[in-house]
A protein has these predicted regions:
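Acidic/glycine-enriched edge-of-secondary-structure segments
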Residues: 24-32, 78-85
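Hydrophobic membrane-insertion alpha-helices, especially the h-region
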Residues: 5-26
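Alpha-helical transmembrane signal-anchor/signal-peptide segments
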Residues: 27-51
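Short acidic/polar alpha-helix capping motifs at helix-coil junctions
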Residues: 6-10, 29-38, 58-62
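Membrane-embedded segments
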Residues: 58, 62-147
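Predominantly cytoplasmic-facing regulatory/coupling regions of multi-pass membrane proteins
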Residues: 1-3
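Secreted/periplasmic serine-hydrolase-like ester/acetyl group-modifying domain
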Residues: 125-178
Length: 178
């Protein structure tokens, strides 16, 4: 009985610590909410909704700068642009996997510029596609496949990167809900 109580206490502590770290990640993460690069609304917004879409666009900034969902809506086509700056194809693959769990689109469009441009990894751009992606196996695999090992920890747990932001926190940081 003592053994079971001890295990339950440890499991309870792990759950409490995990929830606290998850909330701290949300509070400390940089809030990229200035248009047109408002990744909070583009990425976290999609994963917090439960709406079906006919068409979903993926890829680099060329996708969100080139397609207009409002034009498609006028034709009766529901669409979403799930793209980010310099999003590598390795990340796009996991974006598609995660997106089709929530919506069964009739068409998927992938901007393949990254395959042609051979962009170098740029820390700011990396965080635009990793920070707001939901935690889970697809996020872990996306980070493993698209980034060098020395960058894995801060992208799985953004608090490692942003822990020094505590002096610049604003009210909106505490109200973030994704």
């Amino acid at each position: 009985m003592k053994y079971i109580k001890r295990i339950l206490k440890i499991v309870g502590l792990v759950i409490i610590l995990s929830l606290a770290l998850a909330k701290l990640n949300i509070i400390f993460i940089r809030k990229s909410d200035v248009k047109p690069w408002d990744m909070i609304n583009k990425i976290a917004g999609y994963f917090n909704e439960d709406k079906p879409y006919d068409v979903i666009f993926f890829g680099t900034s060329h996708a969100y700068c080139s397609f207009d969902t409002e034009d498609l809506a006028e034709s009766g086509v529901t669409s979403y642009i799930l793209a980010s700056q310099k999003q590598p194809l390795e990340a796009t693959y996991y974006y598609i996997k995660e997106a089709i769990k929530r919506s069964k689109p009739k068409a998927i469009y992938v901007d393949v510029l990254d395959a042609l441009a051979m962009n170098e990894i740029d820390e700011g751009s990396v965080h635009t596609y990793t920070d707001y992606f939901p935690m889970g196996i697809n996020k872990a695999m996306m980070i493993k496949d698209s980034l060098p090992p020395e960058e894995w920890a801060e992208n799985v747990m953004p608090l490692i990167k942003y822990h020094t932001r505590w002096r610049s926190l604003e009210e909106k940081d505490y109200k973030a809900k994704w």
